[in-house]
Amino acid sequence: MSEEQWVSLSSEEFDQLQKYSEYSSKKIKDVLAEFNEGGSLRQYDPHKPISYDVFKLFMRAYLEVDLPQPLSTHLFLAFSQKPRQETPDHPKEGASSSEPNVSDYNSDNAAKADEACAPDTESKTTKTQAPSKELEAAAPWEDPGALASSSDAPVVYLKDVVCYLSLMETGRPQDKLEFMFRLYDSDENGLLDQAEMDQIVSQMLHVAQYLEWDPTELRPILKEMLQGMDYDKDGFVSLQEWINGGMTTIPLLVLLGMDDSGSKGDGRHAWTLKHFKKPTYCNFCRAMLMGVGKQGLCCIYCKYTVHQRCVSKTIHGCVKTNSKAKRSGEVMQHAWVEGNSSVKCDRCHKSIKCYQSVTARHCVWCRMTFHRKCELSTVCDGGELKDHILLPTSICPVSGDRQGGKSDGSVAAKGELVTQYKIIPSPGTHPLLVLVNPKSGGRQGERILRKFHYLLNPEQVFNLDNGGPTPGLNFFHDTPDFRVLACGGDGTVGWILDCIDKANFTKHPPVAVLPLGTGNDLARCLRWGGGYEGGSLTKILKEIEQSPLVMLDRWYLEVMPREEVENGDQVPYNIMNNYFSIGVDASIAHRFHMMREKHPEKFNSRMKNKLWYFEFGTSETFAATCKKLHDHIELECDGVEVDLSNIFLEGIAILNIPSMYGGTNLWGETKKNRAVIRESRKSVTDPKELKCCVQDLSDQLLEVVGLEGAMEMGQIYTGLKSAGRRLAQCSSVTIRTNKLLPMQVDGEPWMQPQCTIKITHKNQAPMMMGPPQKSSFFSLRRKSRSKD
């Protein structure tokens, strides 16, 4: 390992690589299978060093796109090293290992562990670090082709690359440990020697540094882990010894991506490594957490905080999230956690100093904080979020012999005695079911998930990656007056509404939205905004308490292709919540979608998205792929054909809500003196009558808008033009096409061969409205002047 020549990625490049990994549908195991017979990489030997060209092929197979040249070159140089010299400690593949001298191994074990965990002076994660001089000579930055053409060009060992990338993937820690073991067990004898373990630990340390861990804490922990893994002291580590050692090293589990879903309610902490912005003390040893990176481990459920070195000690357990009593009526007691409460005491209202870690404590459930001498009643009522929170005394067990799953959606073996839980909420409360899509908004969803785990009971917060909305809906199925908070984009909201339909509720629960990411047209219409920007979640929860209800129309989308045509792309949804369009805007959206899948790092902000949309709109203006759309479609509104022969259109949009493309209103505003609320649902196509038609998301009517071209679409999107051309307002729409055309529903585009499309009303879903926007100073001035 001493001959290794590391070139660190910058933090921006590491984030860029993670985004590519998140967008890819492939796993490392899938790509390794390509080296087998019949695979796309079958002509290469994965056990031998690979060149830059093979490295690019491997990364393309894994990420499904070509990496940008600077990132690809820098990543290759980060793994490049001189060919390894075979030593007795690292036997050749297929060779039988001679039995080592156990005493020599034990005496040298600590030294080897020190070497594996030693500081890597050539891998500091600085943004400006350049390749070493030796590598620059072999592979100049400006000429990546020299990486392959030079006779002494650097190479990489595929094992190192695979181990590194596998640490970035989601999955169970025990699966990652087993995967890395089998990856480095080159002779397949079921044993790892010290050199092989050193290589794995080296990759772990590099990933940890990119994640802003403080290596001064992690190195001695990994050193101790290596020393203790070899339980029988025979000089080698078996698979079971490797997994047992890794699964009992909590900082390593956090690095591997600890799955905390199974620890809810059983008193186990769910740890995350954290950087503290203010002085913080260890709850075990009382010493301050030091360091410039992420200094310590913090439980996402109760905020119990410890050093990495203290986490393996005998520490207090986490809070219980449910009750052991089989009947309601149990009195809820405070669940105290000491220290790290730099706020005012809720009794004496005096400030609590950060160093008073022993003299003050706070309750996990109600958030009340007291000096020890100021504590009042021991009874906890849930605090300011008591209308939403499920206290542990409200989740009671019901034992029974049942084949299937628990009431919270988890699966049990046949005939196994499982513990079911029922929710008995406090009178007058409205328990909140929180469903979080961790993939929404980049990493924003993951942070939101952790915050809600602390603000509410972890039992009522569900990760949509673990079985979707169904487990949470099943857990709350018989709970009266509960509400749902959907955390994600419009697609996540539609997914949750579909699952609510299938859950057969007697009364559908109302749904509020915490929008993550960009776009979020439905959330905008419901006044929840275009995207969460880091405000107080407690404030949002208080706003939900006062939210009025509105019924959202939902529509069937039936696409019937003609029998004689070939199958096109798969239709994304058969339910429409927001809008459907065909023609120029769908063509732009399709190009936008394809480019975002290929280069996700270029679409990480609303401003960048608008610029890309403008570029695609400009190119579509010259291409005019949907010119003379009226020659290729027939439009019927409530069974009446709309004459398009005298209208030169390149696109048609069917609207349910007054927002599209992140806030664009294609229907336009209707002046108040012209607005007419229609009592009948008869189709309206007369241009004069359409000027008076008001758009409403709960009127069981659709609005049909025509678009003249990409230039007009761009003007509407950028605010230079108010709206498109109103064609109709009706309760059902039928469209027939005679050629391949771009289409989209709720922001998901596809290419559709000739077909018949029918849009009819499905049902209405109760949604919660956000608070009305506060009037600005200038609007108040205008109002006061008008009164004068």
From Swiss-Prot:
Tissues with expression: Expressed in hippocampus and cerebellar Purkinje cells and weakly and diffusely expressed in the granule cells.
Record SMART domains: C1, DAGKa, DAGKc, EFh
Keywords (A to Z) from UniProt: ATP-binding, Calcium, Cytoplasm, Cytoskeleton, Kinase, Lipid metabolism, Membrane, Metal-binding, Nucleotide-binding, Repeat, Transferase, Zinc, Zinc-finger
Domain (DAGKc) ranges: 427-561
Protein name listed in UniProt: Diacylglycerol kinase gamma
Composition-biased stretches (Polar residues): 95-109
Ligand binding (Ca(2+) 1): D185, D187, N189, E196
Gene Ontology cellular component terms for the protein in this record: cytoskeleton; cytosol; membrane
Entry keyword annotation includes Zinc-finger: yes
Zinc fingers classed as Phorbol-ester/DAG-type: ranges: 268-318, 333-380
Region listing for Disordered, in residue ranges: 83-149, 765-788
Occurrences of domain EF-hand (ranges): 172-207, 217-252
Subcellular location(s) per record: Membrane; Cytoplasm, Cytosol; Cytoplasm, Cytoskeleton
GO molecular function, one term: calcium ion binding
Biased composition range(s): Basic and acidic residues: 83-93, 111-125
Reaction catalysis annotation: a 1,2-diacyl-sn-glycerol + ATP = a 1,2-diacyl-sn-glycero-3-phosphate + ADP + H(+); 1,2-didecanoyl-sn-glycerol + ATP = 1,2-didecanoyl-sn-glycero-3-phosphate + ADP + H(+); 1,2-di-(9Z-octadecenoyl)-sn-glycerol + ATP = 1,2-di-(9Z-octadecenoyl)-sn-glycero-3-phosphate + ADP + H(+); 1-octadecanoyl-2-(9Z,12Z)-octadecadienoyl-sn-glycerol + ATP = 1-octadecanoyl-2-(9Z,12Z-octadecadienoyl)-sn-glycero-3-phosphate + ADP + H(+)
Known EC number: 2.7.1.107
Binding residue positions for Ca(2+) 2: D230, D232, D234, E241
Phenotype of gene-disrupted mutants: Homozygous knockout mice show impairments in motor coordination, long-term depression/LTD and development of Purkinje cells. The level of phosphatidic acid in synaptosomal membranes is significantly decreased. The number of branches, the total length of the dendrites and the membrane capacitance of the distal dendritic region are significantly lower.
GO biological process, one term: diacylglycerol metabolic process
Activity regulation: The activity is calcium-dependent. Requires phosphatidylserine for maximal activity.
CDD domains attached to this UniProt entry: C1_DGKgamma_rpt2, EFh
Family from the record: Belongs to the eukaryotic diacylglycerol kinase family.
Protein's pathway: Lipid metabolism; glycerolipid metabolism
Function of the protein: Diacylglycerol kinase that converts diacylglycerol/DAG into phosphatidic acid/phosphatidate/PA and regulates the respective levels of these two bioactive lipids. Thereby, acts as a central switch between the signaling pathways activated by these second messengers with different cellular targets and opposite effects in numerous biological processes. Has no apparent specificity with regard to the acyl compositions of diacylglycerol. Specifically expressed in the cerebellum where it controls the level of diacylglycerol which in turn regulates the activity of protein kinase C gamma.
